[in-house]
């Protein structure tokens, strides 16, 4: 394959580097859900640097296989799009990460109202709160019928899950 061979000579390195460049997108797509996220991201970044250097050499350098570089560029762009789509929910959950508190009762102006576990639970978003039995702990005072959580540290919203 022309570009790497002209860069590395006609030796073994050029041949294996070509096969590496062609096989890594397939390997990344196959191992996307097997490997950990960090391994996936590091492999994709390493591959992107190798591919960027390769395409730069093909387009700017003295190689003749420009069409080959554009095929690799298209494969790389598909890989990047797939990686972005795959990472967006994770990034969103990292930035919006809050622990969930599940309560079995709601305090209303007329008194605490129990919520059967079989039908509905009130899930409260808050930082570091926990539920023990029917009591909310870690600074949570009460959940009102309006669905607002009042605590010493912050206020969060209670959601009913059907």
Curated annotation (Swiss-Prot):
Kindly state which keywords UniProt assigns to this record, in alphabetical order: Disulfide bond, Host membrane, Membrane, Transmembrane, Transmembrane helix, Viral envelope protein, Virion
Which ranges make up the Virion surface topological domains here? 1-10, 62-67
Name the record gives this protein: Membrane protein
> Which family does the similarity line name?
Belongs to the arteriviridae membrane protein family.
Which ranges sit in the Intravirion compartment? 32-40, 89-162
Q: What organism is this sequence from?
A: Equine arteritis virus (strain Bucyrus)
- Documented effect of changing residue 8 to S: Complete loss of infectivity
Per its UniProt record, what Pfam families does this chain match? Arteri_Gl
Task: Tell me what topology the record assigns in the membrane.
Answer: Multi-pass membrane protein
Does the keyword NAD belong to this entry?
no
| Residue intervals passing through the bilayer | 11-31, 41-61, 68-88
Q: What does this protein do?
A: Major envelope protein.
- In terms of superkingdom, the source organism counts as Viruses
Query: What are the GO cellular component annotations?
Result: host cell membrane; membrane; viral envelope; virion membrane
């Amino acid at each position: 394959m022309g570009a790497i061979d002209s860069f590395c000579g006609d030796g073994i390195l050029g041949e294996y580097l070509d096969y590496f460049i062609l096989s890594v997108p397939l390997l990344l797509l196959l191992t996307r859900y097997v490997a950990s996220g960090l391994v996936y991201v590091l492999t994709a970044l390493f591959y992107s640097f190798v591919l960027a250097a390769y395409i730069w050499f093909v387009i700017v350098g003295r190689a003749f296989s420009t069409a080959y570089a554009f095929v690799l560029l298209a494969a790389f762009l598909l890989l990047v799009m797939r990686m972005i789509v795959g990472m967006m929910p994770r990034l969103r959950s990292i930035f919006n990460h809050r622990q969930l508190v599940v309560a079995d009762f709601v305090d209303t102006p007329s008194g605490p109202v129990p919520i059967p576990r079989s039908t509905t639970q009130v899930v409260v978003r808050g930082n570091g709160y926990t539920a023990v039995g029917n009591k909310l702990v870690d600074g949570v005072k009460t959940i009102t019928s309006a669905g607002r959580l009042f605590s010493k540290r912050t206020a969060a919203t209670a959601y009913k899950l059907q």
